Regions:
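Active-site phosphate/ATP/adenylate-binding loop shared across adenylate-forming ligases
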Residues: 1-15
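Short beta-strand-centered segment that lines the nucleotide-binding/catalytic pocket of NTP-utilizing
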Residues: 1-3, 23, 47
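Conserved catalytic network of the ASCE P-loop NTPase/AAA+ motor domain
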Residues: 11-15, 26, 36-37, 71-74
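Switch II (G3) loop of P-loop NTPases
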Residues: 17-31, 197-203
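AMP-binding/adenylate-forming
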Residues: 18-22, 34, 39-46
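A short acidic, amphipathic alpha-helical/loop segment
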Residues: 30-33, 90-94, 211-215
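Acidic, Mg2+-coordinating active-site environments of NTP-dependent enzymes
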Residues: 41-196, 221-224
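Active-site beta-alpha connecting loops in nucleotide-dependent enzymes
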Residues: 179, 201-242
Length: 242
């Protein structure tokens, strides 16, 4: 927000090569204001969904509000876009109009610049094969959650601009720790019973909840019962009934 972005920028050192900032919004113009402060060389739009939708008439208005960061990316800079997203073409056109280079990532869209080719289970872990530009690269990851794979693809798209990703260690994403409340797994004890808890309580919107349920479905539990505890989904405004 208007406090977090300046604080993050002030925390950067003149010796830092890169700065990574998250730009949030719940109304039109907020990303425009913040991205004008940042003047990013590279921008990333992960996806468009009904998060913080209370101040928008429809999801296209959300997509247009997110696109404000593209307009404020430096000329000849880069925008990283999800080719599987419904508004990919819209954002791509805006980038072209503003002389911004586009790098796409995806799982379903096989024309993506950075795309998932295959995923193979190896014991309790997974090997993902990624195609980026004209080469393939494999990485080991600890789970096959779709949102996690999308994040990896987006990160690789960013890194491919300045880094030779073929030289990355195959375990570079393996030990990534999920932030608390965003799908982290812990073991708790209630009434002397051990319970495996997957915590997704940080925030909720239709897409993140769908991802959480799909991820939970992948967790095998033959000996134990599985429960899904759902709380309120806020900031949807008139879209709540939908």
């Amino acid at each position: 927000n208007k406090y977090g972005v300046p604080l993050s920028l002030f925390n950067l050192s003149k010796n830092d090569n890169y700065g990574v900032l998250e730009v949030g919004m719940d109304k039109k113009g907020e990303i425009d204001y913040l991205s004008k402060i940042i003047k990013p060389d590279i921008s990333v739009i992960t996806n468009i969904n009904y998060a913080h939708a209370k101040n928008f008439k429809n999801i296209k208005d959300i997509a247009l509000a997110k696109s404000e960061i593209i307009s404020n990316t430096k000329p000849n800079g880069f925008v990283i876009l999800n080719a599987d997203d419904n508004f990919f073409r819209l954002h791509q056109k805006i980038a072209t109009k503003n002389n911004i280079n586009t790098i796409s990532f995806g799982i379903k869209n096989h024309k993506s610049d950075v795309k998932l080719i295959s995923i193979i289970k190896i014991d309790n872990n997974f090997k993902i094969n990624i195609k980026a530009k004209d080469f393939n690269k494999s990485f080991l990851i600890s789970n096959n959650f779709q949102n996690n794979i999308y994040n990896i693809l987006a990160a690789l798209a960013v890194m491919s601009i300045n880094i030779d990703i073929t030289k990355l260690d195959k375990k570079v994403f393996f030990n990534f720790t999920t932030p608390q409340g965003r799908g982290d797994l812990s073991r708790i004890k209630i009434n002397k019973k051990n319970i495996n808890l997957i915590d997704e309580s940080y925030n909720s919107n239709p897409l993140s909840l769908k991802s959480a349920i799909l991820n939970y479905d992948k967790v095998k539990s033959k000996k134990f019962k599985k429960y899904l505890l759902l709380g309120d989904m806020l900031e949807l405004g008139t879209h709540s009934k939908k």
